[in-house]
Amino acid sequence: HPEVNWQWHHLPLSMHEPAATAGARLAECAGETGGHATFWQAVAWLYAHTRGDGQGLPEGLRYPDLTPAMQGCLDSDRPDAVIRAQAAEAAQQGIAATPALQLRDRESGKTLLLHGPVEGDALLSAIDLLAAGSTTAAEPAHSPDMPAGVAGDMPR
């Protein structure tokens, strides 16, 4: 979608610690030292190799593209400050679980929060809803054919 900038915000959940913060630190340091493409490469690698239920990476497995600059970042407090700030922002916005997508229209300032995994069509519909400048994004229209309880708060 041409009007979209994708931003990742870390939200390590306590049930996935310490692996969640370790992964977030690696991704942050990859981005700090190598830019956006390196950040996303690290995120993809982490998702491909991380075990579920907060177990993290298998014992002895190391990020293959670790550079001295990345190691210097990992040895510092810099990634922790970014992760803490992003987690605090999420808490302030009422986001307490992952995945969550917050869509923000840069022109109008309107936001739409989608909880849980979001299918591609639903994401595109939500983006289109914000891009259309609809004033009813927060209040779905109701008709006699669709009772209020059925509409919910998800974009359709």
Identify the role of each PLM range:
Residues 59-156:
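C-terminal cap of thioredoxin/glutaredoxin-like
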Residues 1-64, 96, 128, 133, ...:
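Structural alpha/beta surface segment adjacent to cysteine/selenocysteine redox centers
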